[in-house]
Amino acid sequence: PEEICTLVIAESFPEDAGIFTCSARNDYGSVTSTAQLVVTSANTENCSYDSMGEPNSDHFQHFPPPPPILETGSYELASQKPSEIQQVNTPNLGFNMAALQMQFNSAERETNGVHPSHGVNGLINGKAYGNKSPPTPAALLSPTKEPPPLLAKPKLGFPKKASRTARIASDEEIQGTKDAVIQDLERKLRFKEDLLNNGQPRLTYEERMARRLLGADSANVFNIQEPEETAANQEYKVSSCEQRLISEIEYRLERSPVEESGDEVQEAEVPVENAAAPFFEMKLKHYKIFEGMPVTFTCRVAGSPKPKIYWFKDGKQISPKSDHYTIQRDVDGTCSLHTTASTLDDDGNYTIMAANTQGRVSCTGRLMVQAVNQRGRSPRSPPGHPHARRPRSRSRDSGDENEPIQERFFRPHFLQAPGDLTVQEGKLCRMDCKVSGLPTPDLSWQLDGKPIRPDSAHKMLVRENGVHSLIIEPVTSRDAGIYTCIATNRAGQNSFNLELVVAAKEAHKAPVFIEKLQNTGVADGYPVRLECRVSGVPPPQIFWKKENESLTHSTDRVSMHQDNHGYICLLIQGATKEDAGWYTVSAKNEAGIVSCTARLDVY
């Protein structure tokens, strides 16, 4: 991503001259850019205005050095006759006058002839001429290679030479002019945005640079500081990371129980063929505003029967009786949530969910609330109120101008959390959760209020999809209790609790034969029983085999029987010669297996 880095010198002095280097580094390398700053000192003879000067006084020939670009010089363009224009052959003025002419033309083109009081460089003072362009001094249009002349318009009479030193502008004048420059630039950007919305050409490179220097929220700041213009909420697009977070919140809310207010009237049932799941005809939008401003989320929902509406902030349901939020619903399905004065705590994701008997649907709008002084500039003084005077030294300590940029923090929020668990002793237990927040929260686990330390039986893992897991293997009776998961970051903390119940391990006992099979003989055509008794904990499973062939199911002639007391029987109705042979019965459970064999003879 691009980033514009700017070094601003509010008032230049000769000692500021030199080579300035900007370096950028990351893990993959570094890059540098170098530029030289030349500061031209003022001439020994400086100009001043004589309020009582005569019309035929000598014209002045020396000027203070021009102010640097993006600063606060305030020369006026005089629409004098060519005979009254004086040329000053000072090479150092060439670049600044070229910049002045470029800005002059740009301002005229972008404002349809209405010339702002200050341009981007702070070099223009003009007036509104309606649809007519002001007369352009001939000297500025001269195609010669000589430096363009500097035009001056004296307030009273013509300027004359004077031996006094130039007056240094006061802090109030400097600050006032800087504010005027910034205000004018914001006006131009707003005007350009209106053109863009109407399909006009895109912003130029210089305008994009100015937008980045002022910040993307320049239009909103302008609205706040000029009350005569209506402040409007600024829509913006959320990042892919925020969109994933929004999707996870909606997925969870649509599958979670909600609190019923009881105020809504129960809708009459509609025929199944006329029923329709809720859907949004107009979804919520994302807004970026300043604290103290009002904001309204609006959408329109339809469905049959009429859906019930629920509002959430960061996954937490908003009560319809909230004092801070006003919730409304019109007959056409338009739903709105409004707050008259937003605070920094209102920053977050706002979700509306519509539900009826056919299903649920939700959509989310992101609200970004910014502090009024977020851009690092002090609020402008109201009209008629001068700026407070601050001490200023030649060293120009810029400590106040290097205030840190305000970061965005989001309190941890659990997107997924487990409920109470019951696990058998000796088994594996896994507790999974997923949390969001900025910066990334740190998770800790507690058992009955005591921290859990990782060891051979307790492991804490984080998967690539952001799911945190506490794994206990094997579970013992000491692991039973109330578990607390705490997520913490710079914005705050959040937690959830669950209870783990450990079921006692059964006392396993291997099967054992109390009575074994006995060798048996039977006459052909008569019934016969092969019987035994077995015990074991848990009760064992029984398997029968004849020779090496398994008897898997009973038939009308050969059936297998078993009761709860361990009695086992193989019943053969009408034995034949083919039934003779060796029979084996096996008993098996988790603790072991045991077998017994006997012979059946048929004669």
Swiss-Prot record:
Q: Which PANTHER family match?
A: CAVP-TARGET PROTEIN-LIKE, IMMUNOGLOBULIN
Q: What does this protein do?
A: Cytoskeletal protein required for organization of normal actin cytoskeleton. Roles in establishing cell morphology, motility, cell adhesion and cell-extracellular matrix interactions in a variety of cell types. May function as a scaffolding molecule with the potential to influence both actin polymerization and the assembly of existing actin filaments into higher-order arrays. Binds to proteins that bind to either monomeric or filamentous actin. Localizes at sites where active actin remodeling takes place, such as lamellipodia and membrane ruffles.
Disulfide partners: 433-485
Task: State the family it belongs to.
Answer: Belongs to the myotilin/palladin family.
GO terms under cellular component: actin filament; axon; axonal growth cone; cytoskeleton; excitatory synapse; filopodium; focal adhesion; growth cone
Q: What is the lineage of its organism?
A: Eukaryota, Metazoa, Chordata, Craniata, Vertebrata
Subunit relationships: Interacts with EPS8. Interacts with LASP1. Interacts with VASP. Interacts with ACTN. Interacts with SORBS2. Interacts with PFN1. Interacts with LPP. Interacts with SPIN90. Interacts with SRC. Interacts with EZR. Interacts with RAI14.
One Pfam match:
I-set
In residue numbers, the region (Disordered) covers 134-156, 373-402
Which gene holds the coding sequence for this protein?
Palld
Q: What is this protein called?
A: Palladin
